[in-house]
């Protein structure tokens, strides 16, 4: 399997062979969905909390006697129906994390990478290096590649100049190749990778590296 490599001017300079184990996997929608949901769930802190009637400050004394006042019966001030009372059935701290087997996580990554390639949403450039931070230069490269936003750019070793050149462009996100994940790839229409990033991904997510 071969894929064209572009330069900064958007011209094809060569073709490289890529691993079918990583970029030629049939798309499994159920698996990708499960991996995406697990990643989103694992990102939740689960620390939101409310106080019950047993935790709010205040007396537990009955406000007035049960009968003879003409008013509706009422207990403590900490009742959920009273102002400043406790919260009934409010959120409590909980663990939202979901376990996903390692083989399933790895296969889901391969599925999305293969889908990006098959649908024409993956482009490979020879390199993305800048002598100084220049947002204009990065914007020119993306325009030459004719990529559609939102765009995810993955490089093997991002430096400060590269990060600063891309961070002010709307709908453009950068990431190290070894941190590619389901959520970022699905949330961004286009995936741009350097040639070295492709090799790093093949080494990391290939069938032989477990």
Swiss-Prot record:
Coiled coil: none annotated. It holds the Pfam family Ribosomal_L4. Keywords: Ribonucleoprotein, Ribosomal protein, RNA-binding, rRNA-binding. One of its GO terms (cellular component) is ribosome. GO terms for biological process: translation. It comes from the Bacteria. The keyword Heme does not apply. The keyword Mitochondrion does not apply. Residues 41-60, 67-98 are annotated as: Disordered. Residues 41-51 have a biased composition (Polar residues). GO terms for molecular function: rRNA binding; structural constituent of ribosome. One of the primary rRNA binding proteins, this protein initially binds near the 5'-end of the 23S rRNA. It is important during the early stages of 50S assembly. It makes multiple contacts with different domains of the 23S rRNA in the assembled 50S subunit and ribosome. Forms part of the polypeptide exit tunnel. Belongs to the universal ribosomal protein uL4 family. HAMAP family: Ribosomal_uL4_B. Part of the 50S ribosomal subunit. This is Large ribosomal subunit protein uL4. It comes from Dehalococcoides mccartyi (strain ATCC BAA-2266 / KCTC 15142 / 195). The gene is rplD.
